[in-house]
Amino acid sequence: VLDDDRLKQGKTIFGVDYFRELLERVRSIRASERRIWQKITDIYAECCIDYDKNSPTTHDFYAMIQNRFHYAITGQTAAEIIYHKADHTKEHMGLTTWKNSPDGRILKSDVSIAKNYLQEKEIRQLERAVTSYFDYIEIQIERQNAFTMEQFAASVNKFLTFNDYRILPDKGRISAAQAKAKAEQEYDIFNRTQPIDSDFDKQIKGMLE
């Protein structure tokens, strides 16, 4: 994470410059167009002084970060949300939003995204929780607190506990593969009767009215 040139210039690894630059990087990531989970993992990679992409700690952090926040808000992991809410008998298959919403066609890729099933209130709560977590990390950097991978991974539950959110006790009862299979099975049934309203259809309909 640290630039080799900085070390050659003789600057202290954890000096003021390190934390100032780290804070700038974190804020740049926050302002980017990356998805929220990508932002968290990007910040993890930037902040951890012993970062190793192949570490079991890193793999576990990347695999569980989304679930920790989903569980904090809904009491379910991402896979559990998808598995229990994907239903071909419901309007829009149970989705509250999708790539082409509100009037566009629902695609198979839409039905395996947990956030697409959340109510507007839950989405606001989720985004607010993640934003507050980013603020918490910035405060730690401003106080010149460095993170190891273990410390950064632990900071998530530390933050959630302090703010009285639910804490995910395990890896959940439904796997990502099970959730995806169930959602796609429901989609295949739903898609048979999904209305198609193309520009051509609209033009013909307008001519007939």
Walk through the language-model features, giving the residues of each.
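Positively charged, phosphate-engaging catalytic surfaces used for nucleic-acid and nucleotide handling
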Residues: V1-E209
